[in-house]
Curated annotation (Swiss-Prot):
<feature type="compositionally biased region" description="Polar residues">
    <location>
        <begin position="515"/>
        <end position="533"/>
    </location>
</feature>
<dbReference type="InterPro" id="IPR008942">
    <property type="entry name" value="ENTH_VHS"/>
</dbReference>
<comment type="similarity">
    <text>Belongs to the epsin family.</text>
</comment>
<feature type="compositionally biased region" description="Basic and acidic residues">
    <location>
        <begin position="245"/>
        <end position="257"/>
    </location>
</feature>
<feature type="domain" description="ENTH">
    <location>
        <begin position="18"/>
        <end position="150"/>
    </location>
</feature>
<keyword id="KW-0597">Phosphoprotein</keyword>
<dbReference type="GO" id="GO:0005543">
    <property type="term" value="F:phospholipid binding"/>
</dbReference>
<keyword id="KW-0653">Protein transport</keyword>
<feature type="region of interest" description="Disordered">
    <location>
        <begin position="436"/>
        <end position="533"/>
    </location>
</feature>
<feature type="compositionally biased region" description="Low complexity">
    <location>
        <begin position="440"/>
        <end position="454"/>
    </location>
</feature>
<feature type="compositionally biased region" description="Low complexity">
    <location>
        <begin position="329"/>
        <end position="348"/>
    </location>
</feature>
<feature type="region of interest" description="Disordered">
    <location>
        <begin position="150"/>
        <end position="396"/>
    </location>
</feature>
<feature type="modified residue" description="Phosphoserine">
    <location>
        <position position="270"/>
    </location>
</feature>
<dbReference type="InterPro" id="IPR013809">
    <property type="entry name" value="ENTH"/>
</dbReference>
<dbReference type="Pfam" id="PF01417">
    <property type="entry name" value="ENTH"/>
</dbReference>
<feature type="compositionally biased region" description="Basic and acidic residues">
    <location>
        <begin position="177"/>
        <end position="236"/>
    </location>
</feature>
<feature type="region of interest" description="Disordered">
    <location>
        <begin position="758"/>
        <end position="784"/>
    </location>
</feature>
């Protein structure tokens, strides 16, 4: 009784206070809902508070009380717990403002997770508060859960409302002040619809207010309408993704045929002429996929159809747009065999199909180009026009280099032969690089009037033999390793030689514009080395090719090289080499290849080619050197022997030397040199460095990198070179050339001179044949001088470069050449060290005129190439030091 009486007294007291203090009804409800009674807040109070929260004025009153309750502690833990319960209910059923405010004050609620209170009975009542605060914070931070809770609440409201007799939902409650503190209009102010949470009596102007004010009130009554209004408004403002009316509709349709199901929603949708679509858009999650209805309506939307490309907002607009896809084939049309300009095509695309895809395709040049491409080929009007790739963006005028690269091989046998090269090209002489193993294709290459115009200077494997070409050379051709035979191929015509330095020729397919110039290589001589000539004036290309050494001079199968080709015993060095290569191919590396060295991709040989033409050493520059075997000058005899050696066609670098065997027989002079040469057999340069012999040709500074020969031997030669510290890899060649050109090598020359002076005594002592070979060319031009050591000229020293000086540097072999200033050349790489070394670049020959030849084996191709010119004469001067040469071999051994 006591408890009951106490409860009654408290109720009366509250009632009195309300009347006396005039406490607002909403506030009173909040106080009752969060009272310290042992029971939880009544459902009717929660519903009233949730609904009142949609009125900004009442909302403020509610929240003030709640936040005050949350600050209670101790024995008033129920205030806290119930306040949390009210907030949790309002998150699902009330205004969205509540959610925002709870987030703002989340820190305050989080502190309640530490709430502690143990009642007199020893029970931990604080745990209730802790759990509730944690769950509320988690809910507010989880948008998905909020959306679920609010949707469920909306569904429940529909059930209650539809079950009411008049479609009205009157929450039960004992308070008569439900509407005392806010008019319907005031309450209608919607959270999220009003920019400021102002108290607006004119809220009726808002969309929802206006809609509901029309006739909903008559149908549903004030309360029902208001609740509906809240619900609709809150949902439309709801960012939490009320899955919309769909769930509500399902529940409505599933059993409640109330006027609400038939009327309220339909009426709302039709009220302002706003379709259900509008409501749907507002109510549906932005990120959610469109519903079927929306998708359909979108298709009918004028905006959509226009965007799709249709000019009229017809439902079929999308279909109209779709036709363009077929035009995806338009590229074919775009590239008619005639190569019609794509501009037209583009226009058609635009007109016919607004479809974005089509337009995009239209602008996609690569695709257009490809489709057009075939027509371009097809449309050869009897005139072999370069296959033009018509691209949407540009006329078909451009040749397709890319296509050339791949297509050339495929089309080698085709009549058009890709027509990539202007038909007017002079003629192509297939000059298989003697070494190129793959060359078969070359030999097969059918004569084609067209020459290859390859910007890169090395045509794809396919080399077209011009009908003009000497067939014999082609046969010998065999296979060339290098895909870009053109480089060697180009006959370096005499005219070209000067430019090419010989290197250029050897590397690039220097197209001698003149077939005549190519005559330099008599086909008869060429037989061993067919030459490929690209009529296409590739002079420009030559330069490039010159820079890049071919994979290696073709190794000819030691073709019988009639040195006779070059009577030039006279030219000794230059011609000699040439003849030795037997190649009229002189222009082409092939010629030199005869010497085993050809392998070296030395470009020198090519240079020598040029020389053959009697080109002065200069022009040949290094080129001559390659030929520079001349010391042998016994062209035919020696040549033949060398040729045999050349059989090896060692790969570049020293390999050639291995040929060492030397049919030293070469003529008397050649003896020493002969041996060396035979070893050097590879390209003249490769052929063991020039012979010390290089007698007379001091003027022609031939750089003899014969040292490469040494590299060839895998065993003894390598041992020597390594022991001497002369290990030079062709790689270094390029470095050398630049320095030599600059004249940086003088220091090296000085050092070498000193060393050479000491060693000059040991001319042909070289343990290695190479050494001999180099030595053999004692004099510059001197074919006879057996030992390089006796270098008649400073140049003589050059001879040793190859071997490290004739005998002296023999050990130098490949590298030895370096020893001398002229050794520069000898050093292969070292040569560069020398001023001349630069020139040697390629061969190193540059150094000493005659002996330079020896260097060729050196084939620094890489480095040398650049210096090619210098070598020639420049070096001689440098070489000037005659005596050193032999010694150079040692001193030079190291740059």
């Amino acid at each position: 009784m006591k408890k009951v009486f106490g409860q009654t007294v408290r109720d009366l007291k509250r009632e009195v206070n309300k009347k006396v203090l005039k406490v607002p009804g909403v506030e009173q409800k909040v106080l009752d809902a969060t009272s310290n009674e042992p029971w939880g807040p009544h459902g009717s109070l929660l519903a009233d508070l949730a609904q009142a929260s949609r009125n900004y004025h009442e909302y403020q009153l509610i929240m003030v009380v709640i936040w005050k309750r949350l600050s209670d502690t101790g024995k008033n833990w129920r205030h806290v717990y119930k306040a949390l319960t009210v907030l949790e209910y309002m998150v699902g059923h009330g205004s969205e403002r509540v959610i925002d405010e709870i987030r703002e004050r989340a820190y305050q609620i989080s502190t309640l997770s530490d709430f502690q209170y143990i009642d007199s009975g020893g029970r931990d009542q604080g745990s209730n508060v802790r759990k509730k605060s944690q769950s509320l914070v988690a809910l507010v931070n989880d948008k998905e859960r909020i959306a679920e809770v609010r949707q469920k609440a909306a569904a429940n409201r529909d059930k209650y409302r539809s079950s009411a007799p008049g479609g009205m939902y009157k929450p039960s409650g004992g308070y008569g002040d439900k509407y005392d503190y806010g008019s319907r209009d005031e309450e209608r102010s919607s959270y999220g619809r009003e920019r400021e949470y102002g108290y607006r009596d004119d809220d009726r102007n808002s969309r929802d207010g206006d809609r509901h004010s029309r006739d909903s009130e008559d149908r549903y009554g004030r309360d029902g309408n208001r609740d509906d209004d809240y619900r609709g408004r809150s949902r439309s403002v709801d960012n939490y993704g009320s899955r919309g009316r769909s769930s509500e509709r399902e529940r409505e349709d599933d059993g409640h045929s109330s006027s609400r199901g038939s009327g309220a929603r339909a009426d709302d949708n039709s009220q302002d002429g706003r379709g259900g679509l509008q409501r749907k858009f507002s109510e549906q999650n932005i990120g959610a996929p469109p519903s079927y209805e929306e998708a359909v309506s979108d298709s009918r939307s004028p905006v959509y159809s226009e965007r799709d490309g249709g000019e009229t907002p017809q439902v079929t607009a999308p279909g109209a747009a779709s036709p363009p896809p077929p035009q995806v084939a338009a590229p074919e049309a775009a590239s008619p065999p005639t190569g019609t300009n794509t501009a037209n095509t583009t226009a058609t695309f635009v007109n016919e199909s607004p479809s974005q895809k089509v337009e995009t395709f239209d602008e996609f040049d690569p695709r257009s180009a490809f489709s057009a491409g075939p027509p371009a080929y097809a449309s050869t009007d009897g005139v072999t026009a370069p296959p033009t790739v018509t691209s949407m963006s540009a006329p078909t005028t451009s040749n397709s280099v890319e296509m050339d690269l791949l297509g050339s091989l495929a089309d080698v046998f085709s009549s058009n032969a890709l027509a990539i090269v202007p038909a007017d090209s002079i003629y192509v002489e297939t000059n298989g690089q003697a070494n190129a193993g793959p060359a078969p294709s070359f030999s097969t290459s059918q004569p084609s009037t067209q020459s290859f115009d390859d910007p890169f200077g090395d045509s794809p494997f396919k080399a077209f033999t011009s009908t003009d070409t000497d067939s014999t050379p082609q046969q010998n051709f065999g296979a060339s390793f290098q895909p870009p035979p053109p480089a060697f191929t180009s006959e370096v015509s005499h005219p070209d030689t000067a430019h090419n330095f010989g290197f250029g020729d050897s590397f690039s397919a220097v197209a001698n514009p003149d077939p005549a110039s190519q005559n330099v290589q008599p086909p008869s001589n060429s037989p061993g080395f067919p030459q490929e000539q690209f009529a296409t004036s590739q002079s420009g290309i030559d330069i490039l090719a010159g820079i890049l050494p071919p994979s290696g001079p073709p190794v000819q199968s030691g073709p019988s090289i009639p040195t006779s080709q070059f009577p030039p015993s006279g030219n000794n060095m230059y011609e000699g080499f040439h003849s030795q290569p037997p190649v009229s191919t002189a222009p082409n590396l092939p010629g030199q290849t005869p010497f085993g060295q050809a392998v070296q991709p030395y470009n020198m040989v090519p240079h020598s080619q040029n020389m053959t033409g009697a080109m002065p050493f200069n022009s040949g520059g290094f080129m001559h050197q390659p030929g520079s075997q001349t010391p042998y000058s016994t062209p035919s005899g020696p040549a033949g022997q060398f040729m045999a050696h050349q059989g090896h066609g060692m790969p570049p670098s020293h390999g050639p030397q291995r040929t060492q065997s030397g049919p030293v027989t070469l003529q008397g002079n050649n003896n020493v040199m002969g041996d060396m040469f035979s070893q050097a057999t590879p390209n003249s340069l490769t052929s063991s460095s020039s012979h010390p012999d290089l007698t007379p040709l001091t003027g022609a500074i031939e750089i003899v990198p014969p040292p490469q020969k040494k590299f060839e031997p895998k065993s003894s030669v390598w041992a020597d070179t390594l022991s001497r510290g002369l290990v030079n890899f062709n790689i270094s060649g390029s470095k050398t050339n630049p320095l030599a050109d600059i004249g940086v090598d003088f220091e090296a020359i000085n050092r070498r001179e000193k060393r050479l002076e000491k060693q000059t005594n040991t001319p042909a002592t070289s343990t290695i044949n190479m050494g001999k070979a180099m030595g053999s060319g004692t004099g510059l031009g001197r074919s006879g001088a057996t030992a390089m050591r006796p270098p008649p000229n400073p140049m003589t020293g050059s001879g040793m470069p190859m071997g490290g000086g004739m005998g002296v540097g023999s050990y130098g072999g490949m590298n030895q050449n370096q020893p001398m200033g002229m050794g520069m050349g000898a050093g292969m790489n070292q040569n560069q060290p020398m001023g001349m070394g630069m020139g040697p670049g390629m061969n190193m020959n540059m150094n000493m005129g005659g002996y330079g030849q020896g260097y060729p084996m050196q084939p620094q191709n890489p480095g040398m190439v650049p210096s090619p010119n210098m070598p020639g004469n420049n070096y001689n001067p440098m070489m000037g030091q005659g005596g050193y040469n032999p010694q150079q071999s040692y001193g030079g051994g190291y740059r």
